[in-house]
A protein has these predicted regions:
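A conserved acidic beta->alpha catalytic loop
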Residues: 37-45, 90
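Cell-envelope/extracellular polymer assembly enzymes that use nucleotide-activated donors
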Residues: 3-5, 176
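Short hydrophobic beta-strand elements that form part
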Residues: 5-9, 57
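Acidic helix N-cap motif at the loop->helix transition within catalytic regions
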Residues: 15-19, 42-51
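Short, well-formed alpha-helical segments that are part of the catalytic scaffolds
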Residues: 12-26
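Catalytic donor-sugar/metal-binding loop of nucleotide-sugar-dependent glycosyltransferases
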Residues: 145, 166-169, 179-195
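Short beta-strand-to-loop acidic/aromatic patch adjacent to the donor-nucleotide binding site
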Residues: 80-89
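Acceptor/aglycone-binding surface of glycosyltransferases and processive sugar-polymer synthases
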Residues: 54, 59-77, 94-171, 197-222
């Protein structure tokens, strides 16, 4: 693959966005790094531009799903063959890009998910349990084995995006992609990535998160 885009959905990521861009640029040229500033109230937009990335801005916060869809449209318009999605908070190690690309050389035509290992010293137990439950549900819905459904670190073929129609607007879009990719006959693969968690407080409530995925399961009947 010669044309690969890196999509970074970002909201108030001023503390990390410059460092992330510099680290990603060791593997992907900065002209192929796209930051979607999703209505940030800090200096995310300015800092991302200064770091050399291409930056698109939502005037208001629309949610991660809408930020990703903006990036997907850009990738298709610019005729990229594939795209990475990577979080702006440095919880995804850019050096893993090499492992994704090596895996992609083995007849890639779907989605590769960066899968975190089981390490309860680094991953909170409640989040680990939630991730396992939702991964099991999405494996059933997609018809393929999904080891880490909550990982947003992914390599996606634009062929997938041309085939499926996405409806979700927030975080559940990442689950919708997996279900529709599997149902459309594309392969969902995985590659090991480091488990990294920042010391800052997580905004994820595992109980609310589980309820959200139950709703996803019900909505998927009409996907």
């Amino acid at each position: 693959m010669n044309r690969i885009l890196v999509i970074v959905p970002a909201y108030n990521a001023g503390l990390t966005i410059s460092e992330l861009i510099q680290k990603v640029s060791k593997f992907i040229d900065k002209t192929n790094i796209l930051v979607i500033d999703d209505g940030s109230q800090d200096q995310t937009f300015t800092l991302a531009q200064k770091a050399g990335a291409v930056v698109l801005k939502h005037e208001t916060n629309k949610g991660k799903g809408e930020a990703l869809k903006t990036g997907f449209k850009y990738a298709q318009k610019k005729n990229y063959e594939a795209l990475f999605t990577i979080d702006a908070d440095l919880q995804h190690d850019p050096s893993s890009i090499r492992d994704f690309l090596q895996k992609a050389n083995q007849n890639f035509s779907g989605i590769i998910i960066g899968t975190r290992g089981i390490n309860l010293k680094k991953m909170p137990l409640a989040r680990w349990l939630t991730n396992n439950l939702t991964s099991a549900i999405l494996s059933i819905l997609s018809g393929q084995r999904i080891r880490d459904s909550q990982s947003g670190y992914r390599l996606i073929s634009t062929c997938v995006l041309k085939r499926i129609k996405l409806k979700a607007k927030k975080y559940d879009l990442e689950s919708e992609i997996l279900v529709k990719t599997g149902r459309s006959g594309f392969k969902i693969d995985s590659v090991p990535i480091p488990t990294i968690y920042q010391e800052s407080k997580s905004f994820i409530n595992p109980f609310v998160d589980t309820g959200r995925f139950i709703r996803i399961m019900l909505r998927s009947i009409w996907w």
